[in-house]
Amino acid sequence: MSGRSAQTKGRRAEIELAGYLQSKGYTEAKAGTALNYGKEPDVKGIDGLHIECKRHEKLQINKWYEQSTADAERMKDGKPVVIYRQNRKQWMIVLSLSDFIELQRGAENGNKSDQ
């Protein structure tokens, strides 16, 4: 796939993912700006997460996670997360176990303070 068609496919995936997240109540989710590739997450508006969006048949999860980690460290905008989808499959998420535990404990503590 050529550079431009790969970019177009990636952009469509970002818009699709943002729409999916919006439909699930994450109303602030938006696809990143096409002109700012590498300067902002692929999908923004989810506090505490740096989202790298991928729409590929051939999985390169470690490579994608390394990219998300490097970008999250550079942008200082949240935990690195890869959300990807293959054709006719559901969206999947990659998050380190330590980040999952930290986020889950934060959610639990937040729920306890609401009671």
Where would I find each of the regions flagged by the language model?
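Catalytic phosphate/metal-binding cores of nucleic-acid and nucleotide-processing enzymes, i.e., regions
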Residues: M1-Q115
